[in-house]
Design a protein with these regions (language model features):
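Loop-centered beta-sheet repeat module
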Residues: 1-51
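Long, well-ordered core segments of solenoidal/helical folds
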Residues: 1-21, 68-86, 129-147
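Alpha-helical packing segments of well-folded alpha/beta enzyme cores
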Residues: 4, 49, 53, 67-70, ...
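Solvent-exposed loop and edge beta-strand segments that line ligand/cofactor-binding
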Residues: 29-48, 59, 63, 67, ...
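Extended, well-ordered alpha-helical segments in internal regulatory regions
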Residues: 53-56, 115-117
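CBM-like carbohydrate-recognition segments
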Residues: 88, 100-189
Length: 189
């Protein structure tokens, strides 16, 4: 697993911005504001996936610190790309081109941050406000019937999604984030 994962990181991880390109075709592309194209949900997959890898590695695994370092590097980029209203957009470095939340991304980011705080990899003082703003933004997108809105449809690049746009992967990410927030609240109470 390590060699394949590291090969992907070497190919798709931007060491300057600490975010991932969706694929090699995206590396030369730029958003309307001239920034690199870092797709929110794609980075959410990685940011939420790293805790699952770390949780399943033995404490003495030689590559464990590699994944922890990657997670904490990404966490800082995730923190910096959060919008003032608490959400993350479909394009992480060009939020003005996509003025609405992208809640599959936002939920994955909240899950990762909550996990990082709970496990001691992210300082609570720095990341708890990010988590709280992110969660509040997600909750505002829950419809009266329980549906979660602002979930970008299946795609391979940033695209806008409205309040009524939903899909199971976004709802699943929201439930994952909520369960991790619950674990975090039990840890600190």
């Amino acid at each position: 697993m390590d060699s394949e994962y590291k090969e992907c990181v070497d190919s798709l991880y931007d060491k300057e911005d600490h975010l991932f390109y969706r694929d090699n075709k995206r590396i030369p592309l730029r958003e309307k504001n001239g920034s690199k194209q870092f797709w929110g949900r794609g980075n959410g997959w990685v940011f939420a996936g790293l805790p699952l890898i770390i949780d399943n590695l033995p404490l003495n695994c030689p590559s464990r610190n590699y994944y922890i370092r990657l997670f904490t590097e990404m966490a800082e980029a995730v923190r910096k790309t959060q919008c003032k209203d608490g959400d993350w957009r479909t394009s992480l470095l060009d939020p003005d081109s996509y003025k609405m939340p992208e809640n599959s991304c936002s939920a994955f980011m909240c899950f990762g941050i909550a996990w990082g705080i709970r496990n001691g990899y992210l300082p609570q003082r720095t990341y708890k406000p990010v988590l709280e703003k992110g969660w509040q933004s997600l909750v505002k997108a829950v419809h009266s019937d329980g549906k979660l809105g602002y979930i970008q449809p299946v795609g391979a690049a940033p695209k806008a999604a409205g309040f009524d746009a939903t899909d199971v992967y976004g709802v699943g990410a929201f439930l994952l984030a909520g369960s991790e927030l619950y674990k975090l609240s039990c840890t600190y109470h």
